[in-house]
């Protein structure tokens, strides 16, 4: 029986600094914006880490932008149309196929040319209203960044083998996707995400222990929202159904992403960091 891994006292500030140290030489040498993907399942702290990395990177003199995959969701009205034309489960944002990936790619292509004459803007998604903010409230830059951080859930994930789609993984799939058409469609959409993954110069994966822990982390977040009476906060039953949309690909990500990552940050059940490896 192997000895348990020691906990590493590394809050976001020191973790962000270590990760920037790891890629500093490559960032400095790059003639175009260096792009880092930060991938983590719900509740893993990817957004917080990305923000801290931006603060520290700019402190080192590197103009930095953070793009969130969540900001590129299609609007509620667009997803309603998808639900009518393709599958009802596409009303719920989150799975591959509910992001406007071509727009994100166009933003990445435009950022090196950003200037006072060429402003580069990208969407900001209002999760409370389940739609995009008006363009007047979108982030806008007028200088080319040295570093771009793209953060999101399951960045880098590859499509599952077709045979893996045969059996449902939960009640949602058994009852609302009995013929498998939704999960096959979502898996097919992942092919369109691969050009984005290939833009990453480095991929950092925040690795949770297992799917049950991810469910608990996300549930804790929702409990906090309910306590604050936040709009669209979900009760336990609604939360469980919502998470079932992501269970299949979350389990796939937990099993496959570490082998595809340049850096893996491992966490225990309580979000304490237990390991950091670089390939």
Question: Where are the regions a protein language model picked out?
Answer:
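Conserved NTP phosphate-binding and transfer environment spanning the P-loop NTPase/kinase superfamily
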Residues: 154-279
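Conserved nucleotide-sensing/catalytic segment adjacent to the nucleotide-binding pocket
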Residues: 65-68, 72-129
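Conserved lysine of the Walker
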Residues: 46
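Extreme N-terminal, non-catalytic leader segments
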Residues: 1-36, 41
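Post-Walker A helix-loop "phosphate-sensing" segment adjacent to the P-loop in P-loop NTPases
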Residues: 55-65
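Phosphate-binding/switch loop-helix module in NTP-utilizing enzymes
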Residues: 107-157
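Residue-level preference for the first positions of well-ordered beta-strands
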Residues: 33-37, 63, 147-149
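Hydrophobic positions on the alpha1 helix immediately C-terminal to the Walker A/P-loop
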Residues: 49, 53
